Structure formats: structure tokens, C-alpha cells
UniProtKB/Swiss-Prot annotation:
Organism field: Equus caballus (Horse)
Encoding gene (name): SCGB1A1
PROSITE patterns: SCGB
GO molecular function, one term: phospholipase A2 inhibitor activity
Protein name: Uteroglobin
Tissue expression: Club cells (nonciliated cells of the surface epithelium of the pulmonary airways). Expressed in lung, uterus, and prostate.
Record function comment: Binds phosphatidylcholine, phosphatidylinositol, polychlorinated biphenyls (PCB) and weakly progesterone, potent inhibitor of phospholipase A2.
Organismal lineage: Eukaryota, Metazoa, Chordata, Craniata, Vertebrata
Family per similarity comment: Belongs to the secretoglobin family.
Gene3D superfamilies according to UniProt: Secretoglobin (1.10.210.10)
Cellular-component GO terms for this entry: cytoplasm; extracellular space
GO biological process, one term: signal transduction
Signal peptide extent: 1-21
Quaternary structure annotation from Swiss-Prot or TrEMBL: Antiparallel homodimer; disulfide-linked. Interaction with LMBR1L is controversial.
Length: 91
């Protein structure tokens, strides 16, 4: 469970690098699918990026881990991500 949270926050950190002034909408859709979508909808959101077999296996495993998180934990993570994305530190 902690692994899923750590990986997700690391992904978000990449999005808030000084090189990216705003979050790519596709990336935001993937994160939303990770936490709120079905496994099929999450796979569909990732598919346009043509992941190889290892990437697909990793994203499936991550989705499975996230799905085991309690709803209040997922909600809190999404709130934190939103707060980080809107922070002046990510501008």
C-alpha cells in the first residue's frame, strides 16, 4: 500500500518539475483513472502512450495496489495531489 502511494507521489513530482508549467491533461486523466476508474478505463487511458509489455504489467500491478486502498485514503491522496498541482511551488 505504501508503495502505491510512494510511486504515485513520485509521478506527481515529475509533473511539478520547473520544466513543466502546467500538468498535461492526459496525465491528469491517467491519475484520475488510477484512483477512481476501473482497471479497463485505466488501461484505456494509458494505451495511447503505447506502453510495452513490461510497462503494461507494471501499470496493472499499480492499479491493483491502488484499488486495495481505502476510499478515504484515495480521496486524501487526490486532495494532496490537487493541492500540490495548484501550489505556487509547482508554478
Amino acid at each position: 500500500m505504501k508503495l502505491a502511494i510512494t510511486i504515485t507521489l513520485a509521478i506527481l513530482a515529475l509533473c511539478c518539475s520547473p520544466a513543466s508549467a502546467e500538468i498535461c491533461q492526459s496525465f491528469a486523466d491517467i491519475i484520475q483513472g488510477l484512483f477512481l476508474g476501473t482497471p479497463a478505463s485505466f488501461e484505456a487511458a494509458v494505451e495511447p502512450f503505447k506502453p510495452d509489455a513490461d510497462m503494461k504489467a507494471a501499470t496493472t500491478q499499480l492499479k491493483t495496489l491502488v484499488d486495495f486502498l481505502p476510499k478515504n485514503t484515495k480521496d486524501s491522496i487526490l486532495k494532496l495531489m490537487d493541492k500540490i498541482a495548484k501550489s505556487p511551488l509547482c508554478a
